[in-house]
């Protein structure tokens, strides 16, 4: 029994299946090649490859290196060609080259995206800054609401005259006085107070300006000289004439009293005093020449001689006396009865007699 033929038994054979697969692969390869050619014509790097130009990845390479690359790619395409008969080695090479050219383009697109984003952020920032500047400029240009000042008070001539007259009389006013003046001038107390303050300040400024003008025109005063006494010169003390004058002892020349003639006193310098002193001296001389004192002689010896001596001590004055001497020759009764010696006026007895004479002159 013969087996039926595979051709007759089945509507298709293995060859038909293989042919269908080959046709499908061929169709798919043709479509892919057309698509690749479309991309090659649009890409500038593929145009350069078709024209036989050199490829460079940022730097120029030798022709030998490019030939080696192309041969390596062709060998890879020949090794893998049995699986895909529709792809020729040239198409595979173009595919690899397209991938190699498209990769840098993708890498180039990434910085562009980053650059675009940075540009957009910068533009946004600039726009915000410009908006802020514009807003600040608008606010600065906008007029600020100014505080409304009170209108300035204008005084009449009569009011100013009265205020000036009162200011000359009294520079500072108390509260009641200010109220009274304000009511008389039909002003407020605050207005009067401010007017007086301004007037005082004006007077102060006028005085300052006047003093400055006088100081500018007037010459400066000469330096003051003060006499300083020199006490030491060249290591030696200096004595001034005034010190010498005051250093001498203070003394007044006066003659001693003379119990005989009683000369004139030397304390007066006037003519009247000199005349009075001369008259007193003449009277004293006349009195001393006409009046004398004498002691009579008395008995002496023993205890009974005391009374006799006492009696003998009484002065005997006579008009024709023998001068200023006192006779005391008979004073033997004193003591143990020794001999007595005559005494001069300078002794104690003579001094007592002279004292009586001086008292009479002073009384005169």
From Swiss-Prot:
Quote the InterPro entries the UniProt record gives: HD (IPR001356), HD_metazoa (IPR020479), Homeobox_CS (IPR017970), Homeobox_NK-like (IPR050394), Homeodomain-like_sf (IPR009057)
Disordered: annotated span: 132-153
UniProt entry keywords in alphabetical sequence: DNA-binding, Homeobox, Nucleus, Transcription, Transcription regulation
Report the principal subcellular site: nucleus
Q: Looking at the record's lineage, which domain of life comes first?
A: Eukaryota
Kindly list the GO CC terms recorded for this protein: chromatin; nucleus
Task: Please give the CDD domains that the UniProt record associates with this protein.
Answer: homeodomain
Q: Which GO terms describe its molecular function?
A: DNA-binding transcription factor activity, RNA polymerase II-specific; RNA polymerase II cis-regulatory region sequence-specific DNA binding; sequence-specific double-stranded DNA binding
Do the record's keywords include Transcription regulation?
yes
Q: Which residues bind DNA?
A: 148-207
Transcription is among the record's keywords: yes
Tell me the Gene Ontology biological-process terms attached to this UniProt entry. CD4-positive, alpha-beta T cell differentiation; cell differentiation; cell fate specification; gland morphogenesis; leukocyte homeostasis; leukocyte migration; lymph node development; macrophage differentiation
Regions of biased composition (Basic and acidic residues) lie at: 135-144
Q: Where in the cell is it found?
A: Nucleus
Q: What does this protein do?
A: Transcription factor.
Protein family (similarity comment): Belongs to the NK-2 homeobox family.
Name of the protein: Homeobox protein Nkx-2.3
- List the source organism: Homo sapiens (Human)
Q: Which gene encodes it?
A: NKX2-3
């Amino acid at each position: 029994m013969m087996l039926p033929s595979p051709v007759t038994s089945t509507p298709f054979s293995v060859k038909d299946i293989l042919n269908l697969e080959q046709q499908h692969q061929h169709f798919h390869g043709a479509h892919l090649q057309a698509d690749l050619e479309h991309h090659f014509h649009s890409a500038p790097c593929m145009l350069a490859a078709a024209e036989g130009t050199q490829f460079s990845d940022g730097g120029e390479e030798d022709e030998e290196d490019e030939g080696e690359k192309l041969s390596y790619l062709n060998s890879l395409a020949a090794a893998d060609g049995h699986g895909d008969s529709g792809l020729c080695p040239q198409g595979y090479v173009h595919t690899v080259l397209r991938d190699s050219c498209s990769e840098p383009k993708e890498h180039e697109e990434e910085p562009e995206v980053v650059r675009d984003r940075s540009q957009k952020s910068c533009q946004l920032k600039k726009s915000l800054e410009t908006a802020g500047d514009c807003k600040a400029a608008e606010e600065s240009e906008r007029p600020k609401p100014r505080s409304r000042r009170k209108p300035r008070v204008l005084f009449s001539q009569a009011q100013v005259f009265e205020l000036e007259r009162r200011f000359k009389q009294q520079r500072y006013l108390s509260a009641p006085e200010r109220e009274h003046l304000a009511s008389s001038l039909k002003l407020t107390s605050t207005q009067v107070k401010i007017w007086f303050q301004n007037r005082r300040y004006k007077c102060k400024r006028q005085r300052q300006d006047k003093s400055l003008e006088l100081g500018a025109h007037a010459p400066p005063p000469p330096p003051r000289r003060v006499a300083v006494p020199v006490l030491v010169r060249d290591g030696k003390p200096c004595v001034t004439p005034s010190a010498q004058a005051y250093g001498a002892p203070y003394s007044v020349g006066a003659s001693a009293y003379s119990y005989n003639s009683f000369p004139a006193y030397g304390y007066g310098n006037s003519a009247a005093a000199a005349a009075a002193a001369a008259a007193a001296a003449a009277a004293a001389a006349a009195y001393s020449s006409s009046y004398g004192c004498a002691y009579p002689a008395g008995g002496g010896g023993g205890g009974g001689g005391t009374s006799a001596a006492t009696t003998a001590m009484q002065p005997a004055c006579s008009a024709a006396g023998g001068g200023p001497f006192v006779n005391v020759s008979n004073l033997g009764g004193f003591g143990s009865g020794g001999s007595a010696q005559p005494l001069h006026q300078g002794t104690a007895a003579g001094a007592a007699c002279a004292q009586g004479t001086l008292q009479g002159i002073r009384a005169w």
